[in-house]
A protein has these predicted regions:
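Middle-to-C-terminal accessory/interaction subdomains
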Residues: 1-25, 29-169
Length: 169
C-alpha cells in the first residue's frame, strides 16, 4: 500500500538484468511521491558504470557502494540488489505477490523489450563501428571486443535469470 508495485518491479528487473551495483537504493536511485497519494514511485534509472559485468572498484566509492556487499558482481549468477545490505528490495522480494508480479513482468519483457535490447546493441555497434579506429586512438580500447564482452555477459546473465524468473508456458 506504500509503493507503486509496477514501478518497483520494473526497477528491480532492470537493476538485476544489469547487475548494477549502484542500484542498491544507497546511491543512484530516484523516487517520488505524488502529493495526493501515499505511494512511493521509482523513476529515473541512471548510473550504470558499474553494471553489465563492468566492475572496476578503483572507480567506485567502496564505502557507499558496498564493494564487500557485492561479491561476484562481475559474474552472471546470483542477485545483486535483492541480496544487497539495503533491506527494502529483499523484503519486497520475499512477498509472494511482489515476486509473482516480477516473474510475470520478466516473462513478458523477455520476448519483447529484452529481445529488442539485444538487437539494439548489435545495431548500435554496427553503426558505431565506423568510428572504431578513432575510438582506439583515443582510449586504447578495442570497441568490437567490448561489444562482444557485453553481449556475452548479457546472454549469460539472462540465461541465469531465465532459470530463476522465466515462467514456462
Amino acid at each position: 500500500e506504500y509503493i507503486d508495485e509496477d514501478s518497483w518491479v520494473d526497477f528491480v528487473i532492470v537493476q538485476e538484468i544489469s547487475k548494477n551495483i549502484d542500484g542498491n537504493l544507497k546511491t543512484s536511485c530516484w523516487m517520488y511521491k505524488e502529493r495526493d497519494e501515499n505511494k512511493l514511485y521509482m523513476t529515473a534509472l541512471w548510473d550504470f558504470d558499474l553494471a553489465y559485468g563492468i566492475v572496476n572498484w578503483s572507480n567506485a566509492d567502496e564505502e557507499r557502494n558496498d564493494a564487500s556487499d557485492c561479491p561476484g558482481s562481475g559474474t552472471y549468477e546470483d542477485f545483486m540488489i535483492i541480496n544487497s545490505s539495503c533491506p527494502w528490495i529483499k523484503k519486497l522480494y520475499q512477498q509472494d505477490e511482489f515476486r509473482e508480479l516480477l516473474t510475470e513482468r520478466y516473462t513478458c519483457y523477455r520476448t519483447t523489450v529484452i529481445a529488442e535490447l539485444q538487437a539494439l546493441i548489435a545495431e548500435q555497434a554496427a553503426y558505431l563501428a565506423k568510428a572504431e579506429d578513432a575510438n582506439y586512438k583515443l582510449w586504447k580500447k578495442n570497441f568490437s571486443l567490448g561489444v562482444a564482452n557485453l553481449q556475452t555477459w548479457l546472454n549469460g546473465r539472462l540465461e541465469w535469470l531465465d532459470e530463476v524468473w522465466l515462467i514456462e508456458n
